[in-house]
């Protein structure tokens, strides 16, 4: 269910704005998206796992807040981010 450190590093390198950037909204959204995808796969086999479902909903909410922040600050950056991540919004 969690992301391996190697996968997290590749996400940080791919979405970082500059070298050493681990906290930008783009990086945070990319990591949250990866975790959301993993949990969605988990729920295909564990339908009744409601405790993890709550965590999923919190992650989706956090990602939504970060995406709204990016959209309010810089809309072209927001559009490129959701396109790169494949988020349907």
From Swiss-Prot:
Pfam families recorded: Ribosomal_S15 (PF00312)
Any one annotated GO CC term: cytosolic small ribosomal subunit
Transmembrane segments: none
SUPFAM superfamilies xref list: S15/NS1 RNA-binding domain (SSF47060)
Gene Ontology biological process: translation
Molecular functions (GO terms): rRNA binding; structural constituent of ribosome
Keywords, comma-separated and alphabetical: Ribonucleoprotein, Ribosomal protein, RNA-binding, rRNA-binding
UniProt entry tagged with the keyword ATP-binding: no
Keyword flag Ribosomal protein: yes
NCBIfam families attached to this UniProt entry: S15_bact
PANTHER family: RIBOSOMAL PROTEIN S15, BACTERIAL AND ORGANELLAR, SMALL RIBOSOMAL SUBUNIT PROTEIN US15M
Role according to the record: One of the primary rRNA binding proteins, it binds directly to 16S rRNA where it helps nucleate assembly of the platform of the 30S subunit by binding and bridging several RNA helices of the 16S rRNA.
Name of protein: Small ribosomal subunit protein uS15
